[in-house]
């Protein structure tokens, strides 16, 4: 989950060394661990006619075109401006939030990943609050749905 999330949210391909430093202890075999995790991800993500994991040179990227990933949908909407979204889109986005970002995932021996994870959780929490704020402002004041979102 950690590897997928990091690659999915990365704006560009990520170096293998960076991923190894981020996710694994150096004394172990981080490149071996990375290869193993990539093989597991390929089994889940790749389609018969499309490889979703791209490994140009010494970097790794995900090809998620045509795939709906909640975190990417939220980040994309935030980049365009939450205040510009209509009521239906705000409702759809608010439904994507279920707990914290990568809830339950902690990697004790990876302080760099944990720092990234905390930053992402703060970012998504902020977006969630903004989405709910704009959603409630667009609902009629007597809407039953308003109390659900205000909670």
Q: Which role fits each region the language model picked out?
A:
Residues 1-23, 41, 102:
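Short amphipathic alpha-helical recognition elements used for nucleic-acid or partner binding
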């Amino acid at each position: 989950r950690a590897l997928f999330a990091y690659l999915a949210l990365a704006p560009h391909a990520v170096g293998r060394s960076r991923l190894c430093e981020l996710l694994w202890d150096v004394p172990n075999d981080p490149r071996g661990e990375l290869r193993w995790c990539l093989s597991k991800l390929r089994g889940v993500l790749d389609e018969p006619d499309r490889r979703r994991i791209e490994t140009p040179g010494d970097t790794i990227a995900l090809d998620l075109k045509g795939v709906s990933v909640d975190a990417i949908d939220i980040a994309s909407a935030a980049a365009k401006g939450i205040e510009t979204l209509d009521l239906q889109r705000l409702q759809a986005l608010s439904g994507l939030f279920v707990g914290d970002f990568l809830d339950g995932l902690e990697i004790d021996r990876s302080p760099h990943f944990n720092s990234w994870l905390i930053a992402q959780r703060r970012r998504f929490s902020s977006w969630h609050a903004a989405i709910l704020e704009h959603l409630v402002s667009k609902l009629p004041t007597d809407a039953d749905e308003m109390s659900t979102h205000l909670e």
